[in-house]
């Protein structure tokens, strides 16, 4: 699962684990790319996205809203859950994104990750990931629905999703990503590993992301000096 940012001379891998229904993953996605725009060595960056399921046992069709699910999961009032989601929406708006979490439909994300893996074979991994983020957080689409996944993939130039989902393609790829996360000890997302040496957890902001990129590059330079 690889996305080349630009033409590279020396690969500087950035491995990112995320789930498409994780708000902080979408925030972190945008923050990382804002940081990358300011990183002097961005042309050497190779982005590798990896699958992570926050709830592998989530149902395909979920009757609860995101607010209701959050309230139940953390034993809080519906009003408090709504207020928490509003704060997240406000943060997204500061990054130029318009979310509607009241319309978000919690669902299983395994097949969405398979579609992202398919997109990677076309060099469209990040485009697919971002499209799924937007579908879930801004458009209230059910991103486990096969027709929806096929439509979203077609929008960015990928066909054959129905046939892929009917079989077992990319099942092993998703499971491999999740096994690797467990082996590394990752328990939450977003999780970034920069050049195999600097770890970043959570959506810490573009400034922190840029600092981490520069730190990893500095360590790399010292090692090769």
Name the predicted role of every residue range.
Residues 29-136:
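Structural alpha/beta surface segment adjacent to cysteine/selenocysteine redox centers
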Residues 1-2, 90:
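Short intrinsically disordered, low-complexity coil segments enriched in acidic
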Residues 3-17, 24-41, 49, 116-225:
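C-terminal cap of thioredoxin/glutaredoxin-like
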């Amino acid at each position: 699962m690889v996305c080349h940012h630009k033409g590279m001379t020396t690969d500087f891998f950035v491995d990112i684990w995320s789930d498409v229904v994780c708000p902080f993953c979408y925030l972190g996605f945008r923050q990382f790319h804002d940081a990358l725009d300011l990183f002097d060595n961005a042309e050497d960056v190779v982005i590798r996205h990896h699958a992570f399921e926050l709830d592998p046992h989530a149902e395909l069709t979920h009757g609860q809203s995101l607010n209701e699910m959050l309230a139940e999961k953390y034993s809080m009032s519906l009003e408090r859950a709504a207020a928490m989601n509003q704060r997240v929406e406000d943060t997204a708006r500061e990054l130029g994104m318009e979310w509607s979490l009241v319309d978000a439909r919690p669902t299983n994300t395994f097949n969405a990750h398979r579609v992202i893996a398919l997109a990677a074979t076309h060099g469209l991994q990040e485009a697919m990931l971002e499209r799924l983020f937007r579908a879930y957080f801004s458009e209230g689409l059910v991103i486990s629905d096969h027709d929806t996944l096929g439509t979203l993939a077609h929008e960015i130039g990928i066909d054959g999703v129905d046939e892929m989902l009917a079989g077992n393609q990319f099942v092993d790829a998703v499971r491999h990503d999740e096994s690797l996360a467990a082996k590394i000890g990752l328990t939450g997302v977003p999780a970034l590993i920069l050049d195999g040496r600097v770890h970043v957890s959570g959506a810490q902001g573009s400034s922190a992301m840029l600092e981490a990129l520069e730190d990893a590059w500095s360590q790399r330079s010292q090692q090769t000096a």
